[in-house]
């Protein structure tokens, strides 16, 4: 009985530590997202909207189609990584990033660089770049503006060449832009 009680205490301790680690991870993701949004003068809710929409789209994809065999853990990882989708905007000139009205073609070319900047930032994290969260965040950063017909950027990927993580976040990002003021 003593051994069982000790085992239960250890299991509770490990469980508490895992929950604390997850909470800290979520907190860091939110802090980084807020830094980018603060600089970009976005609503501050954009990243939260993207995460919620990504979760909803993934849930629908898994439940209603046979197109993807994503596990609940993979869905959670994609939703968490979605917060990094615009992290590369931190490298874009604020005058362009916050310009009211239509961008010139040259300015739009600069804005498009945020996908490559974000992917590069994540790729330079040598210590963590093999971590699943960073790999998925890289895919999302780089390819969330790709289009199924191949007319997106930065690489002009076509159809299923676009990772499912980037496809889902792309839909969430466009939807949020359409419903936001």
At which residue positions do the language-model features occur?
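Amphipathic coiled-coil signal-transmission "stalk" helices
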Residues: 3-6, 10-28, 39, 43-46
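Metal-dependent catalytic cores of enzymes that make or break cyclic nucleotides
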Residues: 37-181
């Amino acid at each position: 009985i003593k051994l069982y009680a000790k085992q239960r205490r250890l299991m509770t301790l490990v469980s508490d530590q895992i929950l604390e680690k997850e909470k800290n991870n979520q907190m860091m993701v939110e802090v980084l997202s807020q830094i980018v949004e603060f600089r970009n003068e976005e609503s501050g809710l954009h990243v939260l909207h993207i995460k919620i929409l990504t979760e909803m789209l993934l849930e629908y994809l898994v439940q209603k189609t046979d197109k993807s065999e994503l596990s609940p853990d993979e869905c959670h990882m994609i939703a968490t990584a979605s917060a990094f989708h615009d992290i590369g905007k931190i490298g874009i000139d604020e005058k362009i990033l916050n310009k009211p009205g239509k961008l010139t073609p040259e300015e739009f070319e600069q804005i498009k660089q945020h996908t490559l900047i974000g992917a590069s930032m994540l790729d330079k994290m040598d210590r963590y770049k093999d971590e699943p969260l960073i790999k998925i965040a890289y895919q999302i950063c780089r390819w969330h503006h790709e289009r199924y017909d191949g007319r997106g950027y930065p690489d002009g990927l076509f159809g299923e060449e676009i990772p499912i993580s980037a496809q889902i976040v792309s839909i969430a990002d466009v939807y949020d832009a359409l419903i936001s003021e």
